[in-house]
Design a protein with these regions (language model features):
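Register position in tetratricopeptide repeats
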Residues: 40, 74, 108, 142-143, ...
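Residue-level recognition of tetratricopeptide repeat
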Residues: 61, 95, 129, 163, ...
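TPR alpha-solenoid repeat register
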Residues: 64, 98, 132, 165-166, ...
């Protein structure tokens, strides 16, 4: 009987602990959301309340160290904020975030050298984290170190493009063009932004500008790639004959044909289908199938069924 009583007590404790863990699992994300909200509006009192509450729930300090540091930074206790970050970086699962925040706090202090070092450490931890590139670029731009500024903006923009953050991609392309109005990479990213916004007329106008720059800078291969992209834009504008013409010109370049030949055939087939020239549509479909027999028809049907902005 005594043994049964002990078993009941143990089971009750286990259930209690399980329920407590379950409740914590539900409430902790809510507290973190509240903490992030009060961080945004810079309500330090509420921030410290939620930080202390999370600590009491045994949330590991490295997971809330950044919020703790930001709260102290809002109070202008910068050294204490930086020390909190330093103490927790080695045990954090995302040290790049802490290094990045450290850079921000150093920058507020006016310690540009350590800010740069912190942002670079953030990049070393995770080269695919875009924000520190932006902060570095801003510093270099302010110091008139144009090449470094452009290179860091471009590093961030490429990451934004890969992750489909098109608005950021467009905004920081404009930042580069304020430094160098003929930077071809930035112009192409701006064009890509306009294309994704379905602002086809602007994207096409930028395409003509790219064409002129490619000629002036003797970047002929890039000029042919631009023809291909302009062909895509013209297709989405419903200008099928013009699209076919540019796709044909683009395919005359070996590099473009090798890289984009399959897509060129698909767009050309779809354009001819739109023009009701089924013989030529079938011909380019057959060429596309030589590259990917399983995907070609689906690719072309997707093009045919796509809702175009026609802006």
């Amino acid at each position: 009987m005594k043994r049964l009583y002990l078993i009941i007590i143990v089971v009750s404790l286990m259930i209690s602990c399980t329920n407590k863990k379950s409740n914590n699992d539900e409430i902790i994300p809510q507290y973190i959301d509240s903490l992030n909200y009060y961080r945004e509006i810079k309500d330090n009192k509420k921030m410290f309340y939620y930080i202390d509450t999370l600590k009491a729930l045994r949330v590991k300090m490295p997971d809330i160290a950044m919020e703790y540091a930001v709260a102290y930074a809002h109070l202008k206790q910068y050294d204490k904020a930086i020390q909190i970050l330093k103490d927790n970086i080695s045990s954090s699962s995302k040290p790049q975030l802490l290094y990045n925040e450290m850079g921000n706090i150093y920058l507020i202090k006016g310690d540009t050298a350590n800010a740069i070092l912190s942002y670079k450490q953030a990049i070393n931890c995770n080269p695919n984290y875009a924000r520190p590139y932006i902060y570095l670029a801003n510093i270099y731009k302010e110091n008139n170190e144009k090449e470094l500024a452009i290179n860091n903006y471009l590093a961030a923009i490429r990451l934004f493009a890969e992750n489909e953050y098109y608005e950021e991609m467009g905004n920081f392309a404009i930042e580069i063009l304020e430094i160098d109005s003929t930077n071809l990479d930035a112009i192409k990213f701006l064009q890509y932004y306009c294309y994704n916004e379905k602002d086809y007329k602007t994207a096409l106008a930028i395409g003509f500008e790219i064409d002129e720059i490619c000629v002036k800078q003797n970047k002929l291969d890039e000029g042919y790639v631009n023809m291909y992209f302009m062909g895509m834009i013209l297709y989405d504008m419903g200008e099928y004959e013009k699209s076919i013409s540019l796709m044909h010109q683009a395919s005359e370049n070996d590099i473009t044909a090798k890289e984009y030949g399959y897509s060129i055939c698909c767009y050309t087939s779809a354009s001819y289908r739109k023009l009701r020239d089924n013989e030529k549509a079938d011909y380019f479909l057959s060429l596309a199938k030589e590259v990917d027999k399983d995907d070609a028809e689906k690719y072309i049907n997707d093009l045919l069924n796509r809702n175009n902005g026609n802006k």
